[in-house]
């Protein structure tokens, strides 16, 4: 048995156990279960005849692609670089094109060389997630890390481009493409305070983006949210809509910021079965232990036989005047946003309005492992979720509304019928509460 077969057996058996309850739903593009004995035998036959890591990575990538809903994939172990050449590059039709650039004139242009090296050869400098087309290796989406300027050739045209931080580049693209480019948007709509948060990412939390509030310039989301909270308290405001539609999650550090709009402490303690915990521990631990040091720390913690993880989510008392919070959610909410939605339903922190989330909030996310061959190619196997993104793990809103198919920049515009419905719901509840008080 060669080393490629041995290592593939580790990956295959591990994924087969991990995804046991999902196997009947995981079909390849040819409607063949990639975990079937036929699929396994076919791959082993290929592996028995290969002689290079590149051939091995090609087969592994093909196997991951057969899990075509993104349940597992190969990825570079390297962290995101501090600085990049500010271009998003994509491979299509056997060529590389600029998809996004601060300089819009470069978009949709074909890149032929970088620093005088043909693009096909230049990508060989990268270790990471490769794909294959007719035997040719390529990277689907390419970002060029660099601390210094690069000369980019577009056919006969050459341009020297200076690097910038990836965070600044992302911000420039968002600002250009989105009229509501700030991560946080605050407004008073028909008498109801409206707070929109586009992303819960750690990067956005640490950003230095500028906000304008009543003529004053404010730097960063923490200061901005604090100014908004003080404004609402000073006006004794009791109702607030928090819109997280389209927010795909990020860091639960944002929960501490939402405490600014809380009138008391809210806590939810829960226990969640991990993917590993759902399986037979005898079989699963045999697979895990077989991986030895190849398996990373985040997975090793599950080896002790504990079938669940104890978790706690809380939002502190911010002494806010806000008594009634309304959380707008939709099917573009994942991860931490789903956690916040579940938390709101469980504790009453907010009344959820909209359509169901896409789940994956109260689960183990994500984890990964590597093997000797993947490690020497600076790659790892990433499993982005617990594979239980099913209806029972989605969050249903307390009040359902018809979901609009909106682009991110269309939220809170005249096209946003969901928000219009939410405003009417909040106004009706506010009027009902005022009437109840007047009758007391």
Predicted stretch roles:
Residues 1-240, 244-248, 256-273, 324-326, ...:
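Flexible, low-complexity junctional segments that flank or bridge functional domains
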Residues 221-225, 311, 336-337:
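Amphipathic coiled-coil/heptad-repeat helices and related helical stalk/stem segments
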Residues 246-251, 333-334:
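Gly/Ser/Thr-rich loops at beta-strand to alpha-helix junctions
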Residues 249-324, 366-367, 371-373, 386-389, ...:
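Gly/Ser/Thr-rich loop/hinge elements
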Residues 284-285, 293-310, 333, 357-358, ...:
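Cysteine-dependent hydrolase recognition
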Residues 324-346, 350-360:
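Extended C-terminal subregions enriched in glycine
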Residues 348-349, 377-381:
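A short pocket-lining beta-strand/turn micro-motif at the edge of beta-sheets
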Residues 384-417:
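Active-site rim recognition segments
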């Amino acid at each position: 048995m060669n080393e490629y077969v041995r290592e593939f057996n580790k990956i295959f058996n591990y994924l087969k156990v991990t995804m046991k309850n999902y196997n009947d739903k995981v079909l390849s593009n040819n409607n063949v279960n990639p975990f079937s004995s036929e699929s396994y035998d076919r791959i082993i036959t290929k592996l028995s005849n290969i002689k290079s890591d590149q051939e091995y990575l090609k087969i592994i990538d093909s196997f991951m692609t057969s899990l075509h809903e993104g349940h597992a994939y190969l990825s570079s172990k390297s962290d995101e670089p501090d600085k990049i050449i500010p271009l998003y590059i994509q491979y299509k039709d056997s060529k590389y094109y600029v998809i996004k650039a601060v300089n819009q004139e470069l978009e949709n242009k074909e890149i032929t060389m970088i620093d005088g090296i043909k693009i096909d050869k230049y990508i060989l400098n990268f270790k990471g997630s490769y794909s294959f087309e007719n035997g040719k290796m390529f990277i689907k989406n390419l970002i060029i890390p660099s601390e210094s300027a690069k000369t980019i050739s577009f056919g006969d045209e050459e341009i020297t481009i200076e690097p910038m931080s990836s965070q600044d580049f992302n911000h420039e693209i968002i600002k250009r493409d989105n009229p509501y480019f700030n991560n946080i948007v605050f407004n008073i709509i028909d008498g109801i305070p409206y707070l929109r948060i586009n992303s819960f990412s750690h990067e956005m939390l640490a950003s230095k983006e500028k906000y304008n509030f009543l003529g004053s310039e404010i730097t960063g989301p923490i200061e901005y949210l604090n100014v908004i909270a003080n404004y609402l308290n000073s006006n004794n405001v009791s109702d607030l809509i928090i819109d997280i539609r389209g927010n795909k999650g990020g860091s639960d550090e944002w929960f501490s910021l939402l405490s600014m709009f809380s009138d008391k402490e809210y806590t939810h303690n829960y226990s969640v079965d991990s993917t590993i915990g759902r399986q037979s521990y005898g079989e699963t631990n045999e697979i895990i232990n077989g991986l030895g040091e190849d398996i990373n720390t985040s997975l090793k913690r599950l080896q002790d036989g504990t079938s669940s993880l104890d978790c706690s989510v809380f939002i502190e008392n911010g002494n806010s005047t806000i008594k009634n919070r309304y959380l707008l959610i939709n099917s573009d909410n994942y991860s931490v946003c789903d956690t916040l939605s579940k938390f709101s339903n469980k504790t009453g922190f907010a009344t959820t309005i909209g359509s169901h989330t896409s789940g994956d909030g109260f689960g183990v996310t994500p984890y990964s492992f590597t093997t000797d061959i993947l490690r020497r190619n600076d790659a790892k196997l990433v499993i982005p979720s617990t594979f239980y993104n099913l209806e029972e793990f989605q969050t249903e809103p307390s009040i359902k509304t018809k979901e609009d198919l909106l682009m991110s920049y269309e939220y809170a515009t005249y096209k946003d019928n969901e928000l219009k419905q939410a405003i009417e719901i909040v106004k009706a509840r506010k009027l009902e509460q005022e009437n109840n008080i007047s009758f007391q």
